[in-house]
Amino acid sequence: LQWGEHENSIQFYCYTDDSIGLHPHIHWIPLIDMDLHGVWNKLMLFKPGILPEGKWLYLDLDVVIQGRLDEIYMAHEFTMVKCYWKPIEQLRSDWVFEGRTIRDHDINSSVMVFWNDENYHIWEHFWENPDDYMITYPGIDGFIYCEGFAPSNYWKQGRIYSRYYGIKEESWYNPPDEPYFLESAAICLLNGQGGL
């Protein structure tokens, strides 16, 4: 939480390798060095013993909370962002990443709800061959989708949107000239921003 107000009953945790500068009310979950590259460390949230017991609302640091999170948190099982701005029927089935062909996807892990023990199987699958998966996929979203772990739960369109791509399918190939803003949404993703 960089700025803003929140109810005192909410506990915040920060999963990072560096606790310097964290607000004293934020609990630190140290990132364990397992020789994972960048975003792949996020998958460790599904590793047994990393998170305290209970239900979790995970937020990347590059999101803006702009409304109430009640509806977001009320998801009862593993839930990720559905990228409504990505026309899944038109996405390439032969996307080449670093010489390997993978399927594109329409999910995003910038916001997730899950129970601490709900996704151990995802971690265990990844840990069977982490080096190969980190080469095969550009990030964990592709891994989760292409390895068959995409959730069946998503928030409805308009609750979470992309500042760069907006909310509508046609925005994927023609992003708005100006950064997109949807006042009624709960969360804005700052994905695809580059220097914005």
Predicted regions and their residues:
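Short, solvent-exposed loop/turn segments at secondary-structure junctions
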Residues: 18-21, 33-36, 63-65, 84-87, ...
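Short, well-ordered coil/turn elements that cap or connect secondary structure elements
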Residues: 7, 23-25, 73-75, 149, ...
